[in-house]
A protein has these predicted regions:
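Non-catalytic alpha-helical scaffolds and adjoining flexible linkers that form interface surfaces
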Residues: 1-159
Length: 159
């Protein structure tokens, strides 16, 4: 995760205004300045919030981004975490039954990758399989245990 500054982005004449919105997947060029990173140019690839099919899907997209902002700090590269998040945003922006169960699995995976949850606590059936390939009936069987491990990790992290 990287935070950067952009000047006059909210003005009507700004060319970067449309691309620099929350929940956008963008391609950006950055310059390291004295006070941090500065945005040079930006091009929007897609906005997962606006592409979401309904209110529940938009809520799931918001939860993914909030989770990342809450637990990820610093300027380290996490390729697997990035890929997992993009896959989850694609998955959650469409219609799904058992949405809460899938959200819990995604949260547990992210917290395990960041070291807040032991990898042994993640069910082996869920570790390497993309969200869209997990059957809903199996996902919801483990939901109570997954939700409990997430709650313990969030309390222990004090974030």
């Amino acid at each position: 995760m990287l935070y950067a500054d952009a000047r006059s982005v909210r003005t009507e004449a700004s060319k970067q205004r449309q691309a620099l919105q929350d929940f956008s997947f963008i391609r950006v060029s950055l310059v390291k300045g004295k006070g941090g990173w500065k945005i040079g140019s930006v091009a929007e690839t897609k906005n997962y919030y606006t592409l979401s099919v309904n209110q529940a899907a938009r809520g799931s997209v918001v939860k993914v981004i909030r989770l990342i902002r809450r637990f990820l700090a610093g300027e380290e590269m996490h390729h697997s975490l990035f890929d997992e998040c993009v896959t989850a945003l694609e998955f959650f922006s469409t219609e799904h039954a058992d949405r809460t169960c899938y959200e819990h699995i995604f949260t547990q995976r992210i917290l395990a990758q960041l070291g807040y949850i032991k990898l042994s606590d993640v069910p082996k059936d869920f570790t390497a399989v993309p969200l869209h390939e997990l059957p809903g009936d199996i996902v919801c069987v483990h939901d109570t245990a997954i939700a409990l491990s997430i709650k313990r990790a969030q309390n222990a992290s004090q974030l």
